[in-house]
Amino acid sequence: MAIRWSELCIVLFALSYAICVLAGKSYYDVLQVPKGASDEQIKRAYRKLALKYHPDKNQGNEEATRKFAEINNAYEVLSDEEKREIYNKYGEEGLKQFSANGGRGGGGGGMNMQDIFSSFFGGGSMEEEEKVVKGDDVIVELEATLEDLYMGGSMKVWREKNVIKPAPGKRKCNCRNEVYHRQIGPGMFQQMTEQVCDKCPNVKYEREGYFVTVDIEKGMKDGEEVSFYEDGEPILDGDPGDLKFRIRTAPHARFRRDGNDLHMNVNITLVEALVGFEKSFKHLDDHEVDISSKGITKPKEVKKFKGEGMPLHYSTKKGNLFVTFEVLFPSSLTDDQKKKIKEVFA
């Protein structure tokens, strides 16, 4: 059953303003668009993200609800020309002052969240976006630390791309076609079509560089992508492609990841293997995990620690931790030691 908007909006509006401020992310980062994004870019980015994180598609998922609140809050500001200008110049504090002085405010104080979504999807129905001609997507392999994938984090990545700039003169484009006839022989004519336009200005490509903040969400797996809509390669008379960061887990000194599970090796002495031991270690977020044993531990024995693996993406659940115990045997024994061991096990 779909979540009721009247109940949902109370929760989302209560969260929406504080979320972006506390997280330290800009509204452009939230919508995954560059600061110079056009109104159409912002609308399309909002549409895609709202479809992805809509509560009806993620029921019971608190993380998706939080993201949906962020997205709506950011869109309310960036879709309003006056609010966006104030935000660009003065940031969050400027929006607060604007609201305090009788302006429409930002962060949940103007539009109704249901109105925002309904303007795109007709009262909440989630239709797929129509296809448009786009430039090439740019895919970047991004190594994320296991710590960031366990707790969530962000990375700043330097990005250079082609940007379309004005240039002198005019250019041929797809605005309109002109049909004319050419004589190719006695009584024979060929109909020709030519793309012409005397209104479109010429353009050129220039390279520009800037930093992109990539959010690493808890539980993301290898191959998952963080997309920045229309921040890929530009194309004349069309929309730019997308910039996509494809996640790869960086090697870790202690853990090996297998989906939602973690694996690690722990060395113990022969005495510890026989009589038991007390051991613990600090996990990726520094909480202590007790792996002690009171019984006999066999070489290569594997013990499972439930809920000590990786968090599942968009879930409060976690995978498991599997610890393989390596028993360190002594390289040699004295005759006296051998005698005592025989006496013990006789």
Curated annotation (Swiss-Prot):
Q: Note the superkingdom of the native organism.
A: Eukaryota
Any one Gene Ontology cellular component term annotated for this protein: cytosol
| Record's signal peptide | 1-23
- PTM: N-glycosylated.
Consequences of knocking out this gene: No visible phenotype under normal growth conditions, but mutant plants are insensitive to seedling growth inhibition in response to the pathogen-associated molecular pattern (PAMP) elf18. The double mutant erdj3b and p58ipk is male gametophytic lethal.
Question: Domain J: where?
Answer: 26-91
Localization:
Endoplasmic reticulum lumen
Expression (tissue specificity): Expressed in leaves, flower buds and flowers.
Please name the InterPro entries in this protein's record.
Answer: DnaJ_C (IPR002939), DnaJ_domain (IPR001623), DnaJ_domain_CS (IPR018253), DNJA1/2-like (IPR044713), HSP40/DnaJ_pept-bd (IPR008971), J_dom_sf (IPR036869)
Q: How does it assemble?
A: Interacts with SDF2 and MED37A/BIP1.
PANTHER family assigned? DNAJ-LIKE-2, ISOFORM A-RELATED
Q: What does this protein do?
A: Regulates protein folding in the endoplasmic reticulum (ER) lumen. Forms a complex in the ER with SDF2 and MED37A/BIP1 which is required for the proper accumulation and function of the surface-exposed leucine-rich repeat receptor kinases EFR involved in pathogen-associated molecular pattern (PAMP) triggered immunity.
Protein name per its UniProtKB record: DnaJ protein ERDJ3B
Q: Which gene encodes it?
A: ERDJ3B
